[in-house]
Structures are given as structure tokens and as C-alpha cells.
UniProtKB/Swiss-Prot annotation:
Protein name: Solute carrier family 66 member 3
Gene3D superfamilies (alphabetical): 1.20.1280.290
Database matches in PANTHER family: MANNOSE-P-DOLICHOL UTILIZATION DEFECT 1 LEC35 -RELATED, SOLUTE CARRIER FAMILY 66 MEMBER 3
Main location: membrane
Signal peptide start-end: 1-19
Entry's transmembrane regions: 33-53, 64-84, 94-114, 171-191
Compartmental location: Membrane
Gene Ontology CC annotations of this record: membrane
Record gene name: Slc66a3
Membrane-topology descriptor: Multi-pass membrane protein
InterPro entries membership: MannP-dilichol_defect-1 (IPR016817), PQ-loop_rpt (IPR006603)
Length: 202
């Protein structure tokens, strides 16, 4: 029973994450706009994913418990490039990419660096969700933001809570997923609220 649940959680998370950002990318392409998408939120999310992936790799945790992160990072990079494209400043992406690539190597130079970064990772990831929430509250329009993407993110956090409890039982990782689950649900609800408000206004 436990092995079956672990298998389902791992593979359903990988399946969901393989297409997680596609609704967001599609919504952005259909709108030909980055309206509603917070650039700081996206950059913070990418930083959080990078730190989390490096931490899991550094400590040799089971590959299936974090295999979705390279997929998520690749999708976030595509999304980020589209945001820069639709905002008319693609060249500004280069310094960010240089920082992210160099960070990958710096994070594993010393154990204390990766441990500190992982503790800050939860704060960084939470800040990315709050940046998106703040932007939605400010513009009161969900624009090209995909509720499906945020809802699927909540699902993956829930499954990762289960897999963490069943494998590594790492408290730092567990706390991160619980906080991210709550915030992803909050963002999803906010996107749906503003979508409903926009429909009523029309």
C-alpha cells in the first residue's frame, strides 16, 4: 500500500510538472502579453527551484523525490523569456541567466552555504508567491495568469508532502512544501476571484 502510494505520488507529480507551466505559457502566447504576470515573482520562483534542486542533489536524496525540478526550471526559463519578450526587453534576461548559472556552482562550494540557502529557499519561494499576490491585488486583474497552473502547483506540493514523509522525512523540506501548498491555494483563489470579477464586469 505504502509503496503504491509513493509510486503514484512520485509519478503523478512528474506527469503534472511535465506540463505545469504550459497553460501559463499558452495563456501568455494567446494574449500576446505578460499582463498579470509578476517578473519579481517569476525570478524568485526560479531562484527557489534552483536552490531546492541543488540541495536535493547535494545531499543525494532519491532522484524521484525531486526529478520534476529540472523540468520546472526549464519551463520557468521559457516563461521568463516570453515575459521579457512581451515587455520588449529580451536583452535584460542575460544578466539574470548569468547569476542563476553561477549560483548553481557557488551553492555547493561549502556545506554551510547550501544549508543556509535551503533555509532561505522557503522564504524566497514564499516571497515569490506574495509578489504575485501583491501584483494581482494591485492591478485587480488576473490577465494572462493561469489558475490551472497555480492549482496544479498546489497539487504537486500536496504530493511532495506525502513523499517527503515517506522517504527523507526532512523537516526543512516538509515545512517548505506545507507553506507553498497554502500559498499556491491562495494565489489560485485570487486568480479565480479576479477572473470572476472581470467576467461580471463584461
Amino acid at each position: 500500500m505504502e509503496a503504491g502510494l509513493l509510486w503514484f505520488c512520485n509519478w503523478s507529480t512528474l506527469g503534472v510538472c511535465a506540463a505545469l507551466k504550459l497553460p501559463q505559457i499558452y495563456a501568455q502566447l494567446a494574449a500576446r502579453s505578460a499582463r498579470g504576470i509578476s517578473l519579481p515573482s517569476l525570478l524568485l520562483e526560479l531562484a527557489g527551484f534552483l536552490v531546492f534542486l541543488r540541495y536535493q542533489h547535494y545531499y543525494g536524496n532519491p532522484l524521484l523525490t525531486y526529478l520534476e525540478y529540472p523540468i520546472l526550471i526549464a519551463q520557468d526559463i521559457v516563461l521568463l523569456l516570453f515575459v521579457f519578450h512581451f515587455n520588449g526587453n529580451v536583452k535584460q534576461a542575460l544578466p539574470y541567466m548569468a547569476v542563476f548559472v553561477s549560483s548553481w556552482f557557488i551553492l555547493s562550494l561549502q556545506k554551510w552555504i547550501i544549508d543556509l540557502a535551503m533555509n532561505l529557499c522557503t522564504v524566497i519561494s514564499a516571497a515569490s508567491k506574495f509578489a504575485q499576490l501583491q501584483y494581482l491585488w494591485k492591478v485587480q486583474d488576473s490577465g494572462a495568469v493561469s489558475a490551472l497552473t497555480w492549482g496544479l502547483s498546489a497539487y504537486t506540493c500536496a504530493t511532495r508532502i506525502i513523499t517527503t514523509l515517506m522517504t527523507t522525512n526532512d523537516l526543512t523540506i516538509l515545512i517548505r512544501f506545507v507553506i507553498m501548498l497554502a500559498l499556491n491555494i491562495w494565489v489560485t483563489a485570487t486568480v479565480l476571484h479576479y477572473r470572476k470579477s472581470a467576467t461580471k464586469a463584461e
